[in-house]
UniProtKB/Swiss-Prot annotation:
Natural source organism: Homo sapiens (Human)
Stretch list, region Disordered: 1-35
Domain of life: Eukaryota
GO molecular function ontology, one term from the record: transcription corepressor activity
Name the record gives this protein: Protein SCAI
């Protein structure tokens, strides 16, 4: 797993926690392992001349492949984390070497066992590295199919107990390898929504950590216990459980399915833009996270991906896929995941995405961050006078929902102001801001005439919902899983599967009608329609309108700051306050028997 820690100029932008992202240092002498193995051959088999030449060559070739694979793997951390072209050839070479290494150890297992002394944990390390390669490839390409490949390798390690003998050796560094494997496996399972497996892995990891800290006098016990706490909180972040008849929890997927986005009507005139790149930025204080991935980032990540397809393996045992088996086109928009980046780091990745954005494509920026508010009154109302959202700095971050600037004569440095995004509006830009100061981005000016839309969260929630903020934002939950968000604001914490599926079907009907409201509107800004041709953006827009309409009808959302806003503004009477949509929301509430929490005659109540 590639980390940015050794490159201070880059953020730790992937899913790598401190404990799962460490890449071992390459050996100082590249031939030392080979020389050691040959000495082992001599000591285990008698005189060197007694060893068949073929077996000597087998061990030598294995050691070469092993050293080469480690060298290439360790080189991954030196690749730039941004840009989509510089790394591909390097990944190809690394895949090729690991393919040869994996097949080689399978074909020559007996010789390697007898002459090299190959241990099962060493086979596990090779499989773990291949799993990491697939995971890296997913992060670089956003192709969810490679998550399945990573999962297959990690599962094989567990099923075949490759690390089972590690605990019998008095080598704490080997146990740490095992613990890191568990942490990486958990990340992949979380991304694949395999929560049952996650729970089993957490229990096993907890037992392993307890044994590790009991046997060795270690200084990292607190860190490993923190890993357990973080993943436990992450699992429990969803506010609503869907239950089978036997009360087992149903795992719901929130990636884009074939029938997920409302279809366009025949003859509907929309733009031909497609979402190509996305920056998902998380910088909320005190929000649940695991592996440098906050709950909000996790939810938005899945909202921008299709359901994964299995890459059919041609091997009986876990093995590598040839390049010909890889998808020839990108199914998902490319994504950068930036956890608490500094301003310079964020701008570097933003500039890289902007530079490589293809023609007729859209760049999406998702900001889940603490609000930065201006202090005092300004003589002007420019793009740097309304504050923005927090970016990281080297100093300690003040706890709380907002950072207030002390020096009134200067703007906040560690802040992404709306004006900072102006240069990137030269290309189609779709912005989502989930923050207590999201309205700062309502004051945009479209300088270059390119399509530009900003979806802005409420700046405050009713008191009854504020204590849930650590488990993720309600606004982002609506964009990721609108039915779960609807249940949550309706006071429901669980639901039977049959009713859930019935409501999902009705919600699909609501989305279709919202799409018609947008495309039939005579007063809507054309920017919305220019983005409407892309499935991901179409679904985000319909969910945004559903979210806004729901909050406007709900009895506890009574302040203006409780409602989402947008730039450009949507025509309320044709969208978020449309009587036809309001009727649908009341009908959904009736299905759930929660109609009493919504106003019946909403227009009259304003």
């Amino acid at each position: 797993m590639v980390r940015g820690a050794r490159q201070p100029q880059q953020p730790r932008s992937r899913l790598a926690p401190r404990l799962t992202g460490t890449v071992e240092k390459p050996p100082r002498k590249r031939r030392s392992r080979t020389e050691f193995a040959l000495k082992e051959i001599m000591s285990s088999g008698g005189a060197e001349d007694d060893i068949p030449q073929g077996e000597r060559k087998t061990v030598t070739d294995f050691c070469y492949l092993l050293d080469k694979s480690k060298q290439l793997f360790n080189g991954l951390r030196d690749l730039p984390q941004y840009g989509q072209k510089q790394w591909q050839s390097y990944f190809g070479r690394t895949f090729d070497v690991y393919t040869k290494l994996w097949k080689f150890q399978q074909q020559h297992r007996q010789v390697l066992d007898n002459r090299y002394g190959l241990k099962r944990w060493q086979i596990g390390e090779i499989a773990s590295k291949i799993g990491q390669l697939y995971y890296h490839y997913y992060l670089r390409t956003s192709e969810t199919s490679y998550l399945n490949e990573a999962f297959s390798f990690y599962s094989a390690i567990r099923q075949r107990s490759y690390y089972s003998q590690v605990n019998k050796e008095d080598r704490p560094e080997l146990v740490v390898k095992k613990l890191r494997y568990y942490a990486r496996f958990i990340v992949v399972c979380l991304l694949l929504n395999k929560m049952d497996v996650v729970k089993d892995l957490v229990k096993e990891l907890s037992d392993e950590i307890e044994d590790y800290t009991h046997r060795f006098n270690t200084e990292d016990q607190v860190e490993w216990n923190l890993v357990l706490q973080e993943v436990a909180a992450f699992i429990e972040a969803d506010p609503v459980m869907v239950l089978n008849d036997d009360n087992t929890i149903v795992i719901t997927s929130n990636r884009l399915a074939e029938t997920g986005a409302p279809l366009l009507e025949q003859g509907m005139i929309v733009g031909q833009l497609s979402l190509a790149d996305a920056l998902i930025i998380g910088n909320c204080n005190n929000q649940v996270k695991f592996s440098e991935l906050t709950v909000d980032m996790f939810r938005m990540l899945q909202a921008l991906e299709r359901e994964p397809m299995n890459l059919a393996s041609q091997m009986n045992k876990p093995g590598m896929q040839e390049s010909a088996d890889k998808p020839t086109r990108r199914e998902n928009p490319h994504k950068y995941l930036l956890y608490k980046p500094t301003f310079s780091q964020l701008y570097t990745f933003l500039a890289a995405s902007f530079k490589e954005l293809p023609a007729n494509s859209v760049l999406l920026i998702y900001l889940s961050a603490t609000g930065v508010f201006p202090t005092g009154r300004s003589d002007s109302e420019g793009p740097y006078d309304f504050g923005g959202v927090l970016t990281n700095s080297n100093r300690d971050i003040i706890n709380g929902d907002a950072i207030h600037k002390r020096n009134q004569s200067h703007k906040e440095m560690h802040c992404l102001h709306p004006g900072d995004l102006y240069p990137f509006t030269r290309k189609p830009l779709f912005i989502i801001v989930d923050s207590s100061n999201s309205v700062a981005y309502k004051n945009f000016t479209n300088l270059f005439g390119q399509p530009l839309v900003c979806l802005l969260s409420p700046t405050a929630y009713p008191k009854a919902l504020q204590d849930q903020s650590q488990r993720g934002s309600l606004f982002t939950l609506f964009l990721n899983n609108p039915l779960m968000a609807f249940l949550f604001v309706s006071g429901l914490s669980s639901m039977r599967r049959g009713l859930w599926e019935k409501c999902q079907e009705y919600l699909r009907k609501i989305n279709r009608d919202i799409a018609q409201l947008l495309t039939h509107s005579r007063s809507i800004d054309q920017a919305f329609l220019q983005f409407f041709g892309d499935e991901f953006l179409r679904l985000l827009l319909t969910r945004f309108i559903f979210c806004s309409a729901t909050m406007r009808m709900h009895k506890i959302f009574r302040e203006t700051r409780n409602y989402p806003e947008s730039y450009p503004q949507l025509p309320r009477d044709e969208t978020v306050e449309n009587p036809h949509l309001q009727k649908h929301i009341l009908e959904l509430a009736s299905i759930l028997d929660v109609r009493n929490v919504f106003f019946e005659n909403t227009i009259d109540d304003y």
